[in-house]
């Protein structure tokens, strides 16, 4: 039985040797043929030479190198495209997702699950701000989007070959892998685990990248941000109509002069702000549609060596 580990890497020269050694020395995986697909996402350090060297000595290491940094989501997709295992497991090279969890994922898969999610029962290794913003994102996404995604589940999971083949059929270029992996469906099971500390290096994700990923997740699987502006427009129009009617009656009945420029200026600025926000939301969707229509490849591989 062949298990493929899909491992995106970006400037991870310190972590890769530790990860590789940990996988190869883990006793419970020695009964399986474990393929390791490293995807070098345009690294500037020695990452590429390290994974190429591993591939020379180990035929089960598949090194993929992008021509530039395309991002983690395209890197994951590239790994799924090139993995040949009966089951495929995306995993981070920093070992925050422990190798010890993998046998439990395999066990659930062998029991009949098409996808086995690895759910973080403890995220204390993440900062408080990251935990809180992640919690808000999951709640917002699951309230307005379909399908829902399991809270506190990242990319670390096991997928059957059938699930991966279905994912590979998806043509979109704007990728939100957590949503895509949920969208394909199938019988799903869950294994809980405690996330560990990072073994080496620093995280390559920052607040801006996480914000863009959250936007991608919502715009890829929900039209609610577009639809809500219809209701906002109705509310604003109703308020404006009521206020206009009140001013007319106030002038006719009580003879009060119509109040001057301050209220007019505030109203114009308020409506202008509302319109600009609405245009911005619309622009997010139009921009993503524009990118999709170009049909550019999700990634470009510079080198594939065995």
From Swiss-Prot:
EC class: transferase
Cell compartment(s), UniProt: Cell inner membrane
Any one Gene Ontology molecular-function term assigned to this protein's record: glycosyltransferase activity
Membrane topology: Multi-pass membrane protein
Segments on the Periplasmic face: 249-262
Annotated transmembrane regions: 228-248, 263-283
Primary location group: membrane
Pfam family, one: Glycos_transf_2
Topology Cytoplasmic: residue spans: 1-227, 284-306
SUPFAM superfamilies the UniProt entry points to: Nucleotide-diphospho-sugar transferases (SSF53448)
CDD domains on file: DPM1_like_bac
GO cellular component: plasma membrane
Recorded family membership: Belongs to the glycosyltransferase 2 family. GtrB subfamily.
Purpose: Involved in O antigen modification. Catalyzes the transfer of the glucose residue from UDP-glucose to a lipid carrier.
Name of this chain's protein: Prophage bactoprenol glucosyl transferase homolog
Organism: Escherichia coli (strain K12)
Lineage of producing organism: Bacteria, Pseudomonadati, Pseudomonadota, Gammaproteobacteria, Enterobacterales
